[in-house]
Amino acid sequence: MFLEKLKLLNSIFEEVESKLSDLSVISNQEEYRELTKQHFYLRPLAEKYIRYSKLLNEIKDAEELQKSKDAEMKEIAFAEYNNLIEKRNQMENEIKVLLIPTDPNEDKNIIVEIRAGTGGNEAALFVGDLYGMYTRFAERNGWKYEVLGSNPTGLGGYKEVVFEINGGKVWRCFKFERGAHRVQRVPETEASGRVHTSAATVAVLPEAEEVDVEIKMEDLRIDTYRASGAGGQHINKTDSAIRITHLPTGLVVACQDERSQIKNRAKAFKVLRAKIYEQRILEHEMRLSSERKQQIGSGDRSEKIRTYNFPQNRITDHRIGYSVYNITEVMDGNLSELVNKLIKADIESKLKENNI
């Protein structure tokens, strides 16, 4: 099965490689870009085809040597055969993963939006905790981040915070964070020691380039106003804050963190483009309802994905039914264990979905 499929993909790879050296193709940017994507996806599979074919031949040779009448030779051949079978099984698992259709957002940077849900001040504090967890996770991985917009409460929390993270594989690691996060803990102001439940929603948007989303100026309403800090007091004497409304979709983005209107405008456009791109992706996924059922989480902000129970020192991811008991470490940015479990579960569901 694998050999025939790899043989076919290898022939397609050779055809794509040939086209990429054709001057008429090189001059056609759209076709060249599409072929480059195919080449990027097929190259590892073509390399596996060569190695896998060679490995199967080595297994055949080891099988023949096991028929030897020489007892010592037979023993060596048997050990070699078992070793090669183990290598084959490992390589087949690697091939399965490579056969999964590539995520078009795999190499994109991201914009993360965290909003306070039910729970008042506790929910706002939880937004701050999640922001700290994600930015420390970014630091651990050498990724850069920058705040694009925030609405602080003045109590160390946020009604909302929006920030971008740039670096390799950020989308792969963060895309499973989309949804509703619930926290259970005793607030510092709670004299009776009663556990309160609060929530925050997280949206993770792949950063869209101009080639991904075209925004027409006639589709926008742009308002300017004075930036305000916690409590509503004005912190700038000029109308530096920006609010952009995308009329066709009704999406609204506001940015006031920078003192410069130009910088706020640039940040707002970046977030708006990502939101429009996300909306298109979700509409496409909705049309593929059977696919959504197979995936680890729908990406819907209202879907409850995780509970952070501080009294029990436990974090539970409800999509995969997995719990960790090191809440302090996780909140300090040590998300790798949870992320790796989610990636593994996602791969398994996609293998099943694609009959691989």
Swiss-Prot record:
N5-methylglutamine is found on Q233
Keyword Nucleus set for record: no
Question: Cross-referenced SUPFAM superfamilies, in alphabetical order?
Answer: Release factor
| Main location group | cytoplasm
Read off the PROSITE patterns from this record: RF_PROK_I (PS00745)
Q: Which InterPro entries match?
A: PCRF, Pep_chain_release_fac_I, Pep_chain_release_fac_I_sf, Prokaryotic/Mito_RF, RF-1
Its post-translational modification remark reads:
Methylated by PrmC. Methylation increases the termination efficiency of RF1.
Where does the UniProt annotation locate this protein?
Answer: Cytoplasm
Question: What keywords appear on the UniProt entry?
Answer: Cytoplasm, Methylation, Protein biosynthesis
GO MF, one example: translation release factor activity, codon specific
What would be one Pfam family of this protein?
PCRF
Key word DNA repair present? no
Cellular-component GO terms for this entry: cytoplasm
Record SMART domains: PCRF
Function, in words: Peptide chain release factor 1 directs the termination of translation in response to the peptide chain termination codons UAG and UAA.
User: Can you tell me which family this protein belongs to?
Assistant: Belongs to the prokaryotic/mitochondrial release factor family.
Listed name of the protein:
Peptide chain release factor 1
Provide the species name: Endomicrobium trichonymphae
Lineage of the species this protein comes from: Bacteria, Pseudomonadati, Elusimicrobiota, Endomicrobiia, Endomicrobiales
